[in-house]
From Swiss-Prot:
Residues 1-20 have a biased composition (Basic residues). It is a single-pass membrane protein. Residues 1-390 are annotated as: Disordered. This is Serine protease HtrA-like. SUPFAM superfamilies: PDZ domain-like, Trypsin-like serine proteases. The active site is at 504 (charge relay system), 534 (charge relay system), 619 (charge relay system). It comes from the Bacteria.
Length: 769
């Protein structure tokens, strides 16, 4: 809301202040009308004061002028108030000291009033005898009776006025006034209210004023002059009105303390009261600064909104007191009051004022302590909050400065980190893919090699069937096992094929039917066979180029757990070319073989163990390594309940030695020592005693028969000798004896034997040729 002079306040705030201003003026007008009516009834005044502020247009104009002047003065002193903030604290301390001084001054005044009371008692006797005093007292009684009739209404009005004045406005509830800066003003207002209460007691208030007035003719003209000055003064602004109110309160307080001293003191106080209606510029400035300091120090108050209701209440109170003083002085000029009654009323009113001042000082002291502690706590909380905000601001400023100084480097660093993370993820993904590809390639290569070796081996493995006569007396299942087997083409010379198979596969037949992987068949001839090694060689002719000879490996370098493939023809031609996979389960196994199926073991075969699946028809099949090279020939398997995948193959190095002799000689020449033997484990106790065998001997053989002129006879070996070791090897039974002797078929050198003869141990050399 624009109120002129470049002052703008909110419209709602303007309306609220205007409403309060008009309410206060209406209340003041009603009060003045009531007072004028009372004065007319009491014939103390000849005419009532004229009504003021009756025109609503003048009200609006005066309110705007007063508010704009106050805001202009306040805005002009805002900067000065900041500089005077420290000074205001000192003023509060001085105000506190001034309160103590006023308390001492009141006590002094009380002493002076006591002395005046004593003088009054002395003059009491003289006044009783004075006729003039009697006439005055009679007149006083008549007029005081009239005043008592009006006193109830006056007291009632006084209470109503006090209630209206003490009622706080909405703006007063929101505004907090600094107690230190307005301490003196509040003291003066409290004392003035006490005087008002005393003045509402009818004749007592009028007698109080008449006590300090000695010359009626001099007093009445002065009061009329003061009335004219008040009526002729120009409208005051809000700061000026507040300044005037405070000065009047201070002067009234000073006058109250000086009642009863002398007539001259009363006149001087009255003149000072009238002279103080014109404020000085310096005092006006101090009051304005104090008022602005009160408004500025209140955090809940709007900086552009003064406490109008409070100012109007104070101004109204001052004007009311001033009007009452005029009424009382006019009443005193028209009445004659006895000195005795005046002094007694003055003494009672003085006591009331002193009690009110003491109570007010105590209350102000308590409020001062409470206000001071509250201000200190508020300052501490505000300082802590400001420190916290300053710390947060400092941190944010440091971060901003750091970012502004180094943001290019930080951006580059973040970019490098992100690039490293991305490259690392890419490389890890590539490496992972490479490893997966390598694994896949390795698996594919392994699978491809295995399949390649299997396909090549299949081309070298054939089906071998002997030509068993139709009138064979063998059982059908027995004949089928002997008649069908597998063979391996270990050598190819032109169209001639050399096939190795098992001796028990070819049996006693010379001709064998050979069927290739492409289902073509030829007839092969048995070149030789050896039952002790269970190997045979078949020769066949074929121009089929699909038949390949197998690559030969080395059985001396076998490794336990090495992967192997077994290729054969289980159950005959229908399942030819079957490939099974396994590993080498054992090395250097001694396997008992029963060739003639008489339930007696005939040979102790040296072989290696495999776990690949071997079925009837796989005999004579090929065992190849991962490179597809032949490392053994399938010879036997254990067929027992609850036994699976325990098969045996003859090492390829032993096979090569046997097939070479079978190709050229058709047979194998083994050394023949010319003896018959029994196992020690099969001897009974009588037989052990007969050969005088020591009890510690558990294994070995006993020579049961020696051929004449045989190698054993030539070696001095006799019947009854017990052989426990041969060629440095522990001898378990006769099969082990035959195996050791046959192992020297190629060199035929003499071997050492440890024997027991007639219970005595000795060694002899056995000749093999």
């Amino acid at each position: 809301m624009d109120i002129g002079k470049k002052h703008v306040i909110p419209k709602s705030q303007y309306r609220r202040k205007r409403r309060e201003f008009f309410h206060n003026e209406d209340r003041e007008e009603n009060l003045n009308q009531h007072q004028d009516k009372q004065n007319i009834d009491n014939t103390t005044l000849k005419k009532a004061e004229k009504q003021i502020h009756k025109d609503s247009i003048d009200k609006h104009e005066r309110f705007k002028n007063s508010l704009s002047s106050h805001l202009e003065q306040r805005n002009r002193d805002v900067n000065e108030n900041k500089a005077e903030e420290s000074k205001s604290n000192q003023d509060s301390k001085s105000a506190y000291n001034r309160d103590h001084y006023l308390t001492d001054d009141v006590s002094k005044k009380q002493n002076s009033l006591d002395s005046v009371d004593q003088d009054t008692e002395k003059s009491k006797y003289y006044e009783q005898n004075s006729e003039a005093t009697l006439s005055t007292k009679s007149t006083d009684k008549v007029e005081s009776s009239d005043m008592r009739k009006l006193s109830p209404d006056k007291n009632k009005v006084g209470h109503e006025e006090q209630h209206v004045l003490s009622k706080p406005s909405e703006h007063d509830k929101e505004t907090r006034i600094d107690f230190e800066s307005s301490r003196t003003d509040s003291d003066s207002s409290m004392q003035t209210e006490k005087i008002k209460k005393d003045s509402s007691d009818g004749n007592e208030s009028s007698n109080l004023k008449s006590e300090v007035i000695s010359d009626k003719s001099n007093t009445v003209p002065k009061l009329s002059e003061s009335d004219d000055e008040v009526n002729n003064q120009k409208p005051l602004t809000l700061p000026e009105e507040q300044k005037l109110k405070r000065q009047q309160s201070q002067n009234e307080q000073t006058k109250t303390y000086t009642y009863g001293d002398s007539e001259q003191n009363d006149k001087s106080n009255h003149e000072n009261d009238l002279s103080h209606h014109t404020p000085s510029k310096s005092d006006d400035k101090d009051n304005v600064m104090r008022e602005d300091h009160i408004v500025d120090n209140n955090p809940d108050n709007d900086i552009n909104t003064p406490s109008l209701s409070k100012i109007d209440d104070d101004r109204k109170l001052d004007e009311k007191i001033h009007v009452e003083d005029k009424h009382k002085q006019n009443a005193d000029s028209s009445e004659t009051v006895g000195y005795q009654s005046q002094s007694s009323v003055s003494h009672r009113s003085t006591e009331k004022r002193n009690m009110a001042i003491n109570d007010h000082h105590k209350l102000n002291g308590q409020k001062l302590n409470t206000k001071t502690s509250a201000n200190n706590n508020q300052k501490k909380a505000t300082s802590k909050l400001n420190k916290g905000r300053a710390t947060n601001n400092n941190y944010s400023d440091i971060l901003k400065k750091f970012w502004m100084m180094y943001w290019p480097k930080l951006v580059i660093l973040m970019g490098i980190i992100i690039l490293i993370v991305i490259l690392n993820a890419i490389f890890n993904n590539v490496n992972k893919n490479d490893r997966m590809n390598d694994n896949n390639d390795a698996d594919a290569q392994k699978y491809t090699t295995t399949m390649k070796n299997a396909n090549n081996t299949v081309k070298s493995v054939v089906t071998v069937e002997n030509e068993t006569s139709k009138d064979s007396s063998l059982p059908k299942d027995k004949a089928s096992q002997d008649e069908v087997g597998s063979g391996v083409v270990y050598k190819k010379s032109g169209d001639t094929l050399y096939i190795v198979t098992n001796a028990h596969v070819v049996g006693d037949k010379e001709n064998q039917k050979i069927t290739f992987s492409n289902n073509k068949s030829v007839v092969g001839k048995v070149l030789g066979k050896d039952k002790w090694s269970d190997l045979a060689v078949v020769k066949a002719t074929s121009s089929d180029s699909s038949v390949k000879e197998i690559a030969i490996g080395d059985s001396n370098n076998l490794v336990l757990g090495e992967p192997i493939l077994v290729v054969g023809n289980p159950l005959g031609v229908d399942f030819k070319g079957t490939v099974t996979e396994g590993i080498i389960s054992g090395l250097n196994r001694n396997v008992l073989i029963d060739f003639d199926k008489d339930n007696k073991y005939d040979m102790l075969m040296k072989a290696f163990q495999i776990d690949a699946s071997v079925n009837p028809g796989n005999s004579g099949g090929a065992v190849v390594n991962r490179e597809g090279k032949l490392i053994g020939v399938v010879a036997a398997k254990i067929s027992m309940p609850n036994v699976e995948n325990m098969s045996f193959a003859i090492p390829v190095n032993e096979v090569q030695k046997i097939v070479k002799d079978l190709e050229t000689k058709g047979k194998i020449d083994y050394p023949d020592v010319g003896v018959k033997m029994k196992n020690i484990a099969s001897l009974n106790s009588f037989e052990r005693q007969a050969v005088k065998l020591p009890g510690k001997v558990k294994n070995g053989v006993v020579v049961d028969q020696v051929d004449n002129n045989g190698l054993a006879d030539q070696s001095s070996l006799k019947k009854g000798d017990v052989i426990t070791e041969l060629d440095g090897k522990l001898l378990e039974d006769d099969l082990r004896f035959r195996q050791i002797i046959f192992s020297h078929k190629d060199d035929l050198k003499s071997i050492t034997a440890k024997i027991y003869r007639d219970g005595k141990e000795k060694e002899i050399n056995i000749k093999l040729k």
